[in-house]
Amino acid sequence: MTEDRPRGNLGKVLAVSLAHLVHDTPSAFLAPVLPLLIDRFGLTVFMAGLLDVVRRIPALANPFLGLVADRICIRWFIIIAPGLTAVAMSFLGLAPAYAVLVILLLVAGVSSAVFHVTAPVMMRHVSTGRIGRGMSFYMLGGELARTLG
């Protein structure tokens, strides 16, 4: 018995998965550099913990971002978000003040929220009938990023 499902486009699936890897690797930089930031800025445990909270707060907008993703071309979000997150996270070491750290992490958080809402939608489009396989590659990219970061 043959399967009538379309084969999917493995190249595009791998491209979206690679984008997930590239996006999430700099996102994982906060934990290793946090002790350095604590020393540099004399942060309390509360202030240090708040930095990660600030980075995650934009995820509360995910339902709204999903509505936006349903109405506009999402390709640009997937292209721009990894670079924006990498730049914001890379500048943490150059931040002159705690407030700048907060702003950089907020930018990284918004970029992350936009990416993580739109990339699975793109994966569904490029997987063409093999959504499970596509999403498994997508998730692999994210897990490898946490390992590398």
Task: Annotate each predicted stretch with a short phrase.
Residues L10-A48, D52-V53:
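Helix-loop boundary and gating motifs at the non-cytosolic
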Residues L60-P96:
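Conserved MFS/SLC helix-loop-helix module at the cytosolic interface between two early adjacent transmembrane helices
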Residues D24, A28, G109-V117, T147:
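Small-residue-rich segments within alpha-helical transmembrane domains of MFS-like 12-TM solute carriers
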